[in-house]
Amino acid sequence: MNGRRPISAALLGAALLLVTACGGGGGSDAGSDGKGKADKAAEANKPSEAVVTIAPKDGAGGVATSGALKVTADKGTLSQVEVEDSKGNPVQGEITGGGTSWTPAHHLAASTKYKVHAVAKDSAGRESAKDSSFTTLTPQNTFVGTFTPEDGSKVGVGMPFSVRFTRGITHPEDVEKAISIKTEPAVDVEGHWFGNDRLDFRPEKYWAAGTKVTVKMNLDGVEGRDGVYGKQVRTVKFTVGRSQVSTVDAKKHMMTVERDGKVIKKIPVTTGKPGYDTWNGQMVISERLRVTRMNGDTVGYGGEYDIKDVPHAMRLTNSGTFIHGNYWGGGTFGNVNSSHGCVGLADVRGGYDKKVSAAWFFDRSMVGDVVVVKNSHDQTVAPDNGYNGWNMSWADWKK
């Protein structure tokens, strides 16, 4: 005898039945689940049906700065598009067309290399990615904009942000779109073109005192006219000072100076005599000169006057209208209009006396202050004759 106890047939049968039942049932379920999981895994491992296309093609050079960059997805939708220049600056854009198209929000810079990374998903959620790079064109002809006020300036409430371009602009909408203005407190600011080389920006009413203005000029790569591109990227910040608006009544020979809505002084003046009447309308001080020469030859009044030391002069128009000190006018101030179109205030030769009207007004004025002339026999000043767009209605300004 080997000492082992025999296993009964009944126990052996029960054991076989147990193994068969567990093994058989488990085997059947595992086969079903395994096939399902395998099918899902196989489906997930299939290549995505989504196709990403980037224009321009990879490695392209001389690419246009506007209208050339576009990312599209076929048989899927875009989930991610990243574009950046060689310095890592991102290009903002928008996915449209139900997720099938992406375009940049603005033009690209010239002579710049860009990298594009785009991802799309098909209906099963499988991703397809594509990377590309290209370089924009190097322009042969360029333009810039000279502007006023300067960065860091403090100006009066009437001062627009004015840009004068070195080339005539034939694509004004593209150029205007490249200049953005933000203010604190916020106010709607609109641009208006005077001819094809000057663009002014202003709010509907005079700036509120204390307004902070930030201008971003992103002109690099903007095609201002066929084959002529901007090359300028600048940020300009300026602040609006206190409010000062002075009203000249040519009929009464009197100027009323208002500071922050309150009258602070009334000053006797002389304006343009018959035939040389002063412009009516709202005029903005664009230049301050403690002493300057005024020669009638420069404004079409040849031989009529040549005064080498006009004191306390502030320009109101490009055509030669000033508000200035007058030491030769005698008793005209407050009594009679005797000038060749300027607004004259009593002064002394050399402008040394701080107590006279012209010195007082000069010392309390800044570029951007407003001088309004009324009751003159001349027409209203043209909006582009100086920074005098305030003489246009808001509706006309926005056209």
Residue ranges and their predicted role:
Residues 148, 244-252, 391-399:
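Short peripheral tails and domain-boundary helices/loops at the edges of structured domains
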Residues 2-242, 269:
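Acidic, low-complexity Ser/Thr/Gly/Pro-rich repeat segments typical of extracellular/periplasmic
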Residues 120-122, 219-222, 261, 291, ...:
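Short, charged beta-turn/beta-strand-edge "cap" motif at the junction between a beta-strand
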